[in-house]
Amino acid sequence: MQSVERAAVVVHSRKDVSVALGRVRAVAERSGVELLFDGEGGNPDIAIVLGGDGTMLRGLARFLENGVPVLGVNFGRVGFLTAIKGDEVEAGLARVFDGEYRIVELPTLELELDGQRHVAVNDTVVTSAELGRLIELQYAIGGEDLGVQPCDGLICATPQGSTAYNLSNGGPVLVWGLDALVVTFVAPHTLHARPLVVGRGVDIVVENRSPDVPAAVLIDGDPVANLALGEGATVRLAPEHSRLAILPEQTFFTRYGQVFGPGANGR
């Protein structure tokens, strides 16, 4: 990659990262890199995120439209999507600013709801809008009706989102590079509901079939709408791709072992 001239900076909104930010400024000054902060233009070559996976998610969504690659420095707990440890800021960013990074293209999700289009980086979830209430969801994949499933919800996750809520509910991890999404139920009340991996060009249609429980639709953890009885939403792979920047030697499997392997993060 070419060396970096301008870098946008995204920070965790509720954490004091002033010390880390000072370290980033020092590296940028030595490397001759201009830093851009919230509200500043300047067409950055890369975005540097100081935080964990939640802040990375916000950064990937923010720069999705203009195609700016996003690189994370981990100041969170898990940091699966981040490339540099918090105590390696100087060495890691010096390499990045010198052009030592590569880009992983990650698929996103498109959700159609009431004529509106939404894009998710991690996942979309349809769940009960009332805490503790079972919901009945009818779902179809690729135009094939697969019936009504009593459950707590349904997750559609991208490869990068497959290690989040999907993983916690027993769904498979999708390796970076797969152009696919995974459909996983949350606490299904059956022995037969299993996760399904779905490719590009296939629609997932989900409808609320509970007469007395509204369904909530969430995109990357944020609620966007409720579905009454008979109302539904459609999810598919979107044309847009997130651009995740990592160090050249890093791979999905090295990150997977470091973050989710035995003994990682206190597990």
Per-range role (PLM):
Residues 1-46, 50, 58, 62, ...:
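ATP/NTP phosphate-donor binding region
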Residues 12, 48, 74, 124, ...:
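A residue-level signal for conserved active-site and pocket-lining positions in enzyme catalytic cores
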Residues 19, 58-60, 82, 166-168, ...:
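Short glycine-/acidic-enriched loop or helix-start segments at secondary-structure transitions
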Residues 49-50, 55-78, 82-85:
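Glycine-rich phosphate/dinucleotide-binding loop and adjoining beta-alpha-beta core of small-molecule
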Residues 64-68, 86-91, 170-179:
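A glycine- and small-aliphatic-rich helix-loop capping segment at beta-alpha/alpha-beta transitions
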Residues 80-153:
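Catalytic core of DAGKc-family lipid kinases
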Residues 118, 126, 131, 142-145, ...:
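ATP/nucleoside-binding phosphotransfer catalytic cores, i.e., glycine-rich phosphate-binding loops
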Residues 134, 148-192:
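Gly/Ser/Thr-rich active-site loops/lids in small-molecule metabolic enzymes
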